[in-house]
Amino acid sequence: MNVKIEQWMNWILYDELMEGKCNAPKQLLGNHDYGEGQMITAYKPHSVNCKVIAPAGKTEYEMEKVDDNGFYALYLPKKKFVGSKYRLVTNYQDGSTVISADPYSFENQIGSMDVYLFSEGNHWEIYKKLGAHPMKLDGVSGTYFAVWAPHARRVSVVGDFNMWDGALHPMHLIGSSGIYELFIPDVGEDAVYKFNILTRYGEEIYKADPFGNCAQFRPDNANVVKDITKYRWKDSTWMENRKTVTRNDAMRKPMNIYEMHLGSWKKKVEDDENGFFSYRELAPMVADYVKDMGYTHIELMGIAEYPFDGSWGYQVTNYYAPTRRYGDPEDFMYFVDYMHKNGISVILDWVPAHFPRDAHGLGKFDGMPLFEHPDSRRGEHPDWGTYIFDFGRNEVSNFLIANAVFWAKEYHIDALRVDAVASMLYLDYGKQDGNWLPNEDGGNENYDAIKMLMKLNKTIEELEPGVFVIAEESTSWAGVTAPVSMDGLGFMFKWNMGWMNDFLEYMKLDPYFRQFNHNRLTFSLMYAYSENFILVISHDEVVHLKCSMINKMPGLHDDKFANLRTAYGFMYGHPGKKLLFMGQEFAQLREWSEVRSLDWYLLDGEDAASHKGIQNYVKTLNHLYNTYDAFYYNDQDQMGFEWISCDDPQSSIVSFIRRGSTAKDQLLFVCNFTPVDRDGFIVGVPCQGKYTEILNSDAEEFGGKGRTNPKPLKAENEPWNNREQSITMHLPPLSVVVFRYDYAEKKPVAKALPKQSTVKKSTPKKK
């Protein structure tokens, strides 16, 4: 062995490399200054020989083979090559020859500021540093890999480009940061990879990339290298307008959400677990349907990659990768772009509460608890069998908040709906006594999760103005939608689970028994303005033997449809934004299942008239909602709602008014929750004028009997419901009737002024 090589060699690192334990390979491999000369070393298992050549190939140096394991070294008395400006020519035992740049000669692309910000939990573009990123370094094309694994003994990149051999590309640990990095030349898009991690206990595990931009199609679970910066967006006007939307603007705008699971909305091939339409195929179908129906937003379930179809996307393994079930990242970008082109906002279901135990996922990522809390009393959900994120660890909260920023910035997502917020807020959520760990004050509030959620909402508001975050929070936690500046959690909206539970229980009742449960109908107005609510009938309400919406309704066929029309009409009149799960707009009979399409055949079957009628009814409701701002403008302002009558439980009839931005086009709702036809029904009204029916759920085009009020009704000076005026109408059984009117102040009656007394001017007498 050349004496210079022997003197230069760090034999401890060499032994670690041979044993597969080296976490600092750049200190041993690559191009190193050595006095006035340089030392170039390489590790090429299964090779016969290795040479160093100039990029142009004119100069060639044979490397000395130090051992039979494939370690080579070359000492040059004078510096010939700068940095990575050389190539390695390796001849292998199978007769192949590979010419490539040296992975260990390239500079680290993660700076000290990146490390500092990540360790502090404040690096909102950390996804541009960690993960796998195709790029050019020193004129060489390849992919830069980086991963956070602080407990690991050694981390290697393995993939279809190196025979999945962990010995070939060990990564370099950056100081004490816990971040490993390596640039591998000639690895480009569509390369398949994982991280091979040697734990401190000597076990080798294979993990998917937490920051990977793309994953394989299940059941395969490796990552795929993708450049997500190439897509040319066409929604610049949409994005510019989005930036101008303030918190107050969002409250005043219509929000009518169609909740969707793309894989089961429509399938290309039924009875095939892989028979999905692609994102690009779905885009025009979804946009056309949603626009025609009059929805303003879609909410997408199951977009971040997940392994198990039955989880519906709520057990995520790849937070930065859209699922491959429907295409690659650019295909999903096209889908979002297409929605924006058609004026449709896109909401993404986002799951920062927990993650699954799949071996390739985040659990015990580097052989020890890393993303999850190390104490199982805080780190595991016994009911769900999942891990809970360690919200108090800076890098973990950074991973989650940066992910929210990522979807808004890189995929132009307009809003995130945070799943299972209650499970984050409470340390004892779903746990038995003795199986949870109290906070430092002895309570059950999760201070770390609270802090993370507040930071999430503040960060999104600052970095992505116009993007909002919705909480699915099922308890009475105060201040969920209060701004962070007021010590609230900072969410823009909260799902109104209380209204949903009470109202659905009310609607399930036989109409006779509704009179004894009248408070279930009216109680929600006691707290309707305590938060910024969205009224939801979500996927959770039409699964697990809860029945579809139509089959929750009591009665025979016609009564069920009449009840459902009444339910939807009352929902649209109630303060709060709206959300309805797919299939319920045309009264799907079966519960929803992720394995099959919605039952679209009902619209062409023997009972098509009923299903088309309810679909047309929801469509009409949606378009009226978008037309009259009384439906939404004052959702968060008490002046936007006023009861006319809510205290007549025996008749189960309620009436109320909704006010918009002006005195014009205000709305009067009259809702009959019994099967009693009431012709000549009197209802008090707020003012004089004409009341024009704009919706009657009993109209024939909706599947009703046609008992409507075709002519405008004039308010009469007959006091009723504590009002000075009233109208007399036909109120069909099990119906909602909506009237439009222009509010007019009562003109004061002019009173005759008292006649002024006149005194005849006296004429003085002549003397």
Where are these regions (language model features)?
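Surface-exposed beta-strand/loop patches in extracellular or lumenal glycoproteins
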Residues: 40-44, 50, 148, 155, ...
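Substrate-binding/active-site clefts of carbohydrate-active enzymes
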Residues: 214-216, 236-255, 261-445, 766-767
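Conserved alpha/beta catalytic core and glycan-binding cleft of carbohydrate-active enzymes
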Residues: 412-414, 432-594, 626-698, 705-706
